[in-house]
Design a protein with these regions (language model features):
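Hydrophobic anchor at the beta1->P-loop junction of P-loop NTPases
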Residues: 35
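Post-Walker A alpha-helix
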Residues: 46-47
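Conserved glycine(s) of the Walker
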Residues: 41-43
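P-loop (Walker A) phosphate-binding loop of NTP-binding proteins
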Residues: 38
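Switch- and interface-adjacent substructures of P-loop NTPase systems
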Residues: 19-20, 53-316
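Nucleotide donor/acceptor-binding cores
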Residues: 31
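N-terminal pre-Walker A segment at the start of P-loop NTPase domains
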Residues: 1-28
Length: 316
């Protein structure tokens, strides 16, 4: 299926799902809130602390309904999406409050938690149409996935050019030396070579990991799954890398260029687009946590890169 037809199909499916959600929401309203942020930004602790405060009557001065005394009851319920892992709320509470206290593990996959709030509605219309119960579905996912969304509007050639151009500036330039040296030995028009593709992908992944290190703290590091591969580790979907391409030259069948381009396109269509249409596009609200202190500590280039990452995401 072409990307155009695939996009039309996904848009139609989302529209149908939206009608269904609207019809269901009249009887039992729900609010889907996405929570994300780059690694070590505090997503897990944030979600756990907010849910704990709601369940146990903690102080949330900006939650107007709570400060007005209109919240009658808050409790957890089974989540609506059976194919999504549950956010391990109880495990994280134990990590933070148990005898052997430690920080919870970082987010490395998408998870969900449903919180139901029974409240006293204000106004006759609101009370009759919406009742006094709201389901809040919290969707937790790695911020690295969010940074992949701009890839939906970039071709392989455009992404390669942008990535290589970014590597010309410090601190990326120093960190990219080994990867760029290998890229310089590759002929995009040469026959496809799996060993060369694997080596290029490995060196590119090492470069991205170095850019994310605490002393550098760069943020614009797509593709996100290269740093959080999960069950995709070692698959062709993650075995590609940018190439130095002639803008006027198209990929020839059977070439290294064609192999890399095909795998990039597959990554976008099989990883990025499903996340966008199945999860991101269905969110009603989005919370993005930003670790500005790490960027400030790493220097001006890290702050500039963080701004670029946020600008790219907000443009999606």
């Amino acid at each position: 299926m072409s990307s155009f037809l695939s996009g039309l199909y996904n848009e139609a499916r989302n529209a149908a799902g939206g009608v269904k959600d609207f019809a269901t929401g009249i009887v039992s309203p729900s609010l889907r809130i996405g929570v994300t942020g780059l690694s070590r930004s505090g997503k897990t602790v944030f979600i756990t602390s907010v849910v704990h405060a709601l369940l146990h009557g903690g102080k949330l001065p900006l939650f107007t309904a709570l400060t007005q005394g209109r919240i009658n009851r808050v409790y957890l319920e089974p989540q609506p999406d059976d194919d999504v892992p549950r956010f391990a709320y109880e495990k994280h509470v134990e990590s933070l409050t148990g005898d052997a206290r430690h920080w919870p593990e970082s987010t490395n996959r998408l998870s969900q938690l449903r919180l139901t709030i029974e409240y006293e509605a204000t106004g006759l219309v609101a009370r009759n149409l919406q009742g006094s119960k709201l389901h809040v579905d919290i969707i937790d996912y790695p911020g690295e996935w969010l940074l992949d969304l701009p890839l939906m509007s970039q071709t392989y050639a455009e992404w390669s050019a942008a990535t290589l151009k970014a590597s010309e500036r410090e601190p990326r330039k120093t960190l990219a030396k080994q990867w760029l040296a290998h890229i310089g030995t590759l002929d995009p028009a040469a026959p496809a070579d799996e060993a060369q593709a694997q080596k290029a992908a490995k060196l590119f992944t090492d470069y991205l990991a170095s850019c994310r290190a605490d002393d550098v703290s760069l943020s614009t590091l797509p593709p996100g799954r290269f740093l959080m591969p999960g069950d995709l580790a070692g698959s062709p979907l993650l075995t590609f890398a940018p190439l130095a391409l002639d803008p006027a030259t198209k990929s020839a069948d059977g070439s290294l260029h064609a192999m890399m381009e095909r795998r990039y396109d597959a990554y976008v269509s099989r990883v990025v687009e499903p996340f966008f249409y199945n999860h991101f596009a269905r969110l009603d609200r989005q919370i993005v946590l930003v670790d500005t202190l790490s960027a400030l500590n790493a220097g001006a280039e890290a702050v500039k890169d963080l701004k670029t990452a946020l600008t790219d995401v907000l443009g999606c």
